[in-house]
Amino acid sequence: VASLPFGGKYRLIDFPLSSLANAGVRSIFGIFQQDNISSVFDHIRSGREWGLSTLLSHYYLGIYNTRVESSTVGKEYYQQLLTYLRRSGSNQTVSINCDVLVNIDLNQVFHLHNTTKGPITVVYKKLPKKDISDVNAILEIDETDHVRSHKLFDNKSTDELFNMSTDIFVVDTPWLIERLEEEAQKEYPEKLRYVLRDLAAKEGAFAYEYTGYLANIHSVQSYYQANIDMLESKKFYSLF
C-alpha cells in the first residue's frame, strides 16, 4: 500500500517518512515486496524531500519475495535488515509502517523510551471496533502503561474501545540485532512487525498512547474513508 495515492498529491509512504524526517532520523531502510519496489523507488527518488540526499543522510530499499499477506518471510529478508542495522551505528531504531496513517512526534516517543530505560517501546491508540481489522494487534496494558500481552483483534468482542497497536516501535539497536539474529535462524521467520509485537509483550514494553488523528488502512473501504476524512478541516490539519 506504500505507493497508494492519498489526499490528492501524496502517497501513503509520505507520512511515515515525514514523521521520521521531523524527528531528525537521517538513515532509513525500507523493505518491500518485490512486485511493489519500483513504484516506491519512483516516488522517493533521491529522498531530497525528506532530507535523505546529503552526505550524512540516506535511505536504502530492500526486497523480499514472499506474498504480501504472508506473515513469514524468506532468509533474504533478515539478511538485508541485519546488514543494515549492523552498519548503521545507531543506538536506537524506529520501526514504522505505511498502513497506519498518523502525524506523530517521534521525539516524544524517543524521550519516553529513554526515560523508561526498557529495550522496546510501542505506540498504541484507543479505537472503536469499526476502525480495526483482524490483522491488527490489540494490547493488554497494565496500570503502569506497560504491555502484558497482545492478540489479534476479535470482532466478536463486546468492548467499546480497544488498545490497537500502531506497529510503531522504538527499540535499542544492539538488543534488536540479537533478537533478529535469533528470529533469522528459525525455519519460518516472521516479518518484523510480528516479531516486535511478540517482543513488546515478552519484555513488558512501555506503551505510549497516541491521541491524534489515525487512519487504519486495512481495506478499500477504510482507504476510501481516510480520503473522505480529509474533507474535514480538523482531521486534515491533524494529519498535515
Where do the PLM segments sit?
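N-terminal glycine-rich phosphate-binding loop and ensuing alpha1 helix
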Residues: 1-49, 55
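Conserved phosphate-coordination/catalytic loops
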Residues: 7, 11, 68-76, 190
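Short, conserved catalytic or adaptor-binding loops enriched in Gly and charged residues
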Residues: 50-63, 140-142, 197-200
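Conserved beta-loop-beta/alpha segment of the NTase-like Rossmann-fold superfamily
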Residues: 57-138
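Catalytic-core segments of class I nucleotidyltransferases/pyrophosphorylases
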Residues: 94, 110, 142-239
